[in-house]
């Protein structure tokens, strides 16, 4: 049985996507726990090859004045035609007013929510208004509640945690599809060190394990991290959260990226295992 609220979400989904199939709308929404933004993301990725600004342009809304005003408070003029966007300075102020610091893990959730492609591009007016409007958040307080929910999910929802972890690679990747090792290490510390107590319900990596992984990359002069290594490291840490776990359970025949195999050899050569 579909509730009245769910029916309204289905109508909104169909209106935004021009999808005439009610069953398809229901499937995408139910698969994403009736979160319309996640449902839209999945729909555009699978049905039309990704979300673009064209989707925002096709669906013009009368945005609430308080939401428009909030964007204007943090935005700066960056084009001669008067186009406004939130630049890094404005973003720092925005995040602080939400009660967070730029280094907090949940800020990656914010970037993911706003569909930021990288850390260099500013946040456009269309981006900011469109996504917050569809989430029903028009004030800082409402946005803060949304991010608090994201924090909770980072602590107890493995699928969501994995999504944000993998997204952080794309956020920092170069045009060649790699991330500099120094940057990768900072993010690994963010995910597995500074937040290890909060995230102990999701994943807990022993400090010695994480430190040796980072030292291995630096000792072996691994300057770039590829996406497969990034993604598989999360599963590696999940399966082997400690050096003892590697010692007793690691199987060299298992299919891990070459860099992780090298890490195992590095540990053996130094008699760590």
Curated annotation (Swiss-Prot):
GO terms for biological process: protein neddylation. SUPFAM superfamilies: UBA-like. It comes from the Eukaryota. Keywords: Ubl conjugation pathway. The keyword Chaperone does not apply. The keyword RNA-binding does not apply. Residues 62-268 form the DCUN1 domain. This is Defective in cullin neddylation protein 1. It comes from Candida glabrata (strain ATCC 2001 / BCRC 20586 / JCM 3761 / NBRC 0622 / NRRL Y-65 / CBS 138). The gene is DCN1.
């Amino acid at each position: 049985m579909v509730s009245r609220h769910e029916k309204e979400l289905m109508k909104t989904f169909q209106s935004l996507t021009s999808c005439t199939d009610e069953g398809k709308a229901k499937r995408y929404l139910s698969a994403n726990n009736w979160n319309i933004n996640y449902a839209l993301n999945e729909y555009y990725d699978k049905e039309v090859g990704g979300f673009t600004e064209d989707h925002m342009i096709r669906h013009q809304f009368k945005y609430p004045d308080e939401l428009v005003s909030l964007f204007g408070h943090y935005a700066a003029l960056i084009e001669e035609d008067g186009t406004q966007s939130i630049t890094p300075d404005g973003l720092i102020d925005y995040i602080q007013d939400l009660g967070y610091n730029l280094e907090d893990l949940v800020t990656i959730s914010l970037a993911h929510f706003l569909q930021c492609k990288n850390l260099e591009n500013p946040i456009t007016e269309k981006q900011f208004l469109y996504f917050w409007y569809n989430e029903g958040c028009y004030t800082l307080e409402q946005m803060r509640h949304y991010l608090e929910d994201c924090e909770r999910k980072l602590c107890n929802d493995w699928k969501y945690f994995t999504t944000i972890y993998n997204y952080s690679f794309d956020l920092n990747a170069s045009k060649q599809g790699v991330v500099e090792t120094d940057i990768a290490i900072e993010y690994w510390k963010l995910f597995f060190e500074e937040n290890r107590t909060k995230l102990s319900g999701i994943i807990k990596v022993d400090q010695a394990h994480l430190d040796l992984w980072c030292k291995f990359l630096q000792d072996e002069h691994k300057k770039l991290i590829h996406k497969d290594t990034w993604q598989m490291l999360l599963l590696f840490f999940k399966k082997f959260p400690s050096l003892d776990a590697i010692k007793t359970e690691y199987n060299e025949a298992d299919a891990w990226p070459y860099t992780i195999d090298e890490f195992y050899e590095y540990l053996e050569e130094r008699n760590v295992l």
